[in-house]
């Protein structure tokens, strides 16, 4: 019963099994389908290769597909036919789908089902993740590729195998330019694929010297020149390393500036070329851009250093013949090309390289007169000295700033002490002046008026005592209402208050002298006159002396300001100190 269910399903097991398409009416539901055909099965219907998933798929109870595979990597019959390049076998496998579906479905349902089965067969992958199209592109079977493209989906064409390559990329690697052309004509965006290490098809083809493939890719996607591998090596780097002359010509004709591009090590294509054996490649690169002959990499190696280290005698001779070549440039290790050559094992190539270098005037590093290095050392020393000076200046400015803060603090404390002292003195003046009006000289009458109210001395006493009182009170009011904090502003207020205190002192003195005439009486006026002379001389002397020094101090400050202004206008490198910033700040009062 089980054997009869696999109609014409048996094939040679060494070639592998196949998928059987059959009607569900002829299948015993109690028998588990197996991918291994029964030896007793009779062949009446062709087989279809559909899937290597190993699963049974039942659709609407009408049909069943059973997977059978063969080959090293679970290849289907379609894979094997594509690998052989057997176009007839490929066409037969795809054609058998129609014959097997006849009688089961019809009309649009038939066409849709056939298309679905055909797509499943064509897009099937083996254990390596390769479709039949990939296999045909890898082996270079153009006709098979064209046939499979008719039934391949966009995802299948761009599908990568486990190594990271798609059909276009593998065709470029193998140099199958006709297949590359067919695939690009089918879908030009396939050229934008990336393989391992971010390699494009152009990079892979250039590295292997497939000139026709390179030309095909450049004609369809010129932007591939701008895309490098993950190490920043582009197609020109890799082609130059392998010495592919025609590929170099094709790439440079597309973009001559490509010769200047560097990889992560700072190497140009010339650095890569001198590692190889082709002098012609070196000539092509130098013709495209002669300046790159002295372009160093990140280790300061020029092409001459690299060629010497690789013992490329012919290339060394070519480089030394160029007028731009300097045979005495130093690497980061402070070595010239001659130092490198002398460090090579003794051989015919190393001896010839040393001869070429000697003829070109090459010297050892310790023999060089190195003014540039000395200049660099001097400049470095100057930079260090300037840096030290700047640091010292910075520290000095910081110290000056701190000293300035301390001076402002001391100055503010001095002003506060002065204002406090002035306040105390002003209060004393006001107290004396206020008390004097109630204890007038000569006593009072019964009605409270002064006994000597009619005398001129009493009137002088009364007026100047009042002036002393109100002046002192004004000073007290200013002192208790002033908002402190601005040194210069407080200083100006103190100057004004000092003048008021002078006035209060003078008024108090006059009031005292006037009251002395009242107290001593007319018989002893000589005593009052003596007190007047003594007091007047003392007060006049003190006030006159203070006035002189105040005026002199103001003149001195004015001269200093002029000198500072002249210095500031002559040099823009100095700025106003924080201490002077408070000079223009206003006075704020409650």
UniProtKB/Swiss-Prot annotation:
Recorded superkingdom: Eukaryota
Subcellular localization(s) per the UniProt record: Cell membrane
Induction notes from the record: By salt and drought stresses.
Ranges for region Disordered: 25-44
GO biological process: response to salt stress
Residue intervals passing through the bilayer: 422-442, 460-480, 500-520, 531-551
Topology within the bilayer: Multi-pass membrane protein
Coiled-coil region: none
SS bond partners: none
Keywords for this protein: ANK repeat, Cell membrane, Membrane, Repeat, Stress response, Transmembrane, Transmembrane helix
InterPro entries: Ankyrin_rpt (IPR002110), Ankyrin_rpt-contain_sf (IPR036770), PGG_dom (IPR026961)
Tissue: Expressed in roots, shoots, leaf vasculature and stems.
Inactivation phenotype: No visible phenotype under normal growth conditions, but mutant seedlings show increased salt-stress tolerance.
Subunit record text: Interacts with REM19/RTV1.
PANTHER family in the record: ANKYRIN REPEAT-CONTAINING PROTEIN ITN1, PROTEIN PHOSPHATASE 1 REGULATORY SUBUNIT
Function in brief: Involved in salt stress tolerance. May act through abscisic acid (ABA) signaling pathways and promote reactive oxygen species (ROS) production.
Protein name from the UniProt record: Ankyrin repeat-containing protein ITN1
Source species of the chain: Arabidopsis thaliana (Mouse-ear cress)
Species lineage: Eukaryota, Viridiplantae, Streptophyta, Embryophyta, Tracheophyta
Name of the coding gene: ITN1
């Amino acid at each position: 019963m089980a054997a009869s269910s696999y109609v014409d399903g048996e094939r040679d097991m060494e070639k592998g099994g196949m998928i059987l398409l059959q009607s569900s009416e002829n299948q015993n539901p109690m028998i588990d389908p197996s991918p291994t055909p029964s030896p007793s099965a009779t062949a009446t219907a062709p087989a279809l290769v559909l899937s290597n998933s190993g699963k049974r798929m039942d659709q609407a109870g009408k049909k069943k597909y059973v997977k059978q595979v063969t080959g090293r990597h679970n290849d289907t019959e379609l894979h094997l036919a594509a690998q052989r390049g057997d176009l007839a076998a490929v066409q037969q496998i795809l054609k058998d789908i129609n014959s097997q579906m006849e009688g089961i479905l019809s009309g649009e349902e038939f066409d849709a089902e056939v298309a679905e089965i055909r797509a499943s067969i064509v897009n099937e992958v083996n254990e390596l993740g390769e479709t039949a199209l990939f296999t045909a592109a890898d082996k270079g079977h153009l006709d098979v590729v064209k046939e499979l493209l008719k039934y391949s989906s966009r995802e299948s064409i761009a599908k990568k195998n486990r190594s990271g390559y798609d059909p276009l990329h593998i065709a470029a690697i193998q140099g199958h330019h006709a297949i590359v052309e067919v695939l690009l004509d089918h879908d030009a965006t396939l050229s934008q694929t990336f393989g391992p290490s971010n390699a494009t098809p152009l990079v892979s083809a250039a590295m292997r010297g497939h000139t026709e493939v390179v030309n095909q890719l450049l004609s369809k996607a010129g932007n591939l020149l701008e895309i490098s591998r993950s190490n920043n090596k582009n197609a020109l780097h890799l082609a130059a390393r392998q010495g592919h002359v025609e590929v170099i010509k094709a790439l440079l004709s597309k973009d001559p500036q490509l010769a200047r591009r560097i990889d992560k090590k700072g190497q140009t294509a010339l650095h890569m070329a001198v590692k190889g054996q082709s002098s012609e490649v070196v000539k092509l690169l130098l013709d495209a851009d002669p300046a790159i002959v002295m372009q160093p990499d990140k280790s300061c190696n020029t092409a001459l250093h690299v060629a010497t280290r690789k013992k490329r005698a012919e290339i060394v001779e070519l480089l030394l013949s160029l007028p731009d070549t300097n045979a005495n440039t130093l690497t980061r290790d402070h070595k010239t090309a001659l130092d490198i050559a002398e460090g090579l094992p003794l051989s015919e190539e190393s001896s010839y390289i040393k001869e070429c270098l000697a003829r070109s005037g090459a010297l050892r590093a310790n023999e060089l007169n190195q003014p540039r290095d000395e200049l660099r050392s001097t400049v470095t020393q100057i930079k260090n000295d300037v840096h030290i000076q700047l640091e010292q200046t910075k520290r000095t400015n910081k110290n000056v700033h701190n000293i300035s803060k301390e001076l402002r603090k001391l100055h503010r404390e001095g002003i506060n002490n002065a204002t406090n002292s002035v306040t105390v003195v002003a209060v004393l003046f006001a107290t004396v002046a206020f008390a004097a009006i109630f204890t007038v000289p000569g006593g009072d009458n019964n009605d409270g008026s002064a006994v000597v109210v009619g005398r001129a001395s009493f009137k002088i006493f009364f007026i100047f005592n009042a002036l002393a009182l109100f002046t002192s009170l004004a000073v007290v009011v200013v002192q208790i209402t002033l908002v402190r904090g601005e040194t210069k502003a407080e200083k100006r207020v103190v100057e004004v208050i000092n003048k008021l205190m002078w006035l209060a002192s003078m008024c108090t003195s006059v009031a005292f002298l006037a009251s002395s005439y009242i107290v001593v009486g007319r018989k002893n006026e000589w005593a009052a006159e003596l007190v007047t002379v003594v007091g007047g001389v003392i007060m006049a002397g003190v006030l006159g002396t203070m006035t002189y020094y105040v005026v002199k101090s103001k003149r001195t400050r004015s001269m200093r300001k002029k000198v500072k202004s002249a210095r500031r206008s002559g040099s823009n490198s100095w700025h106003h100190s924080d201490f002077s910033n408070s000079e223009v700040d206003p006075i704020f009062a409650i």
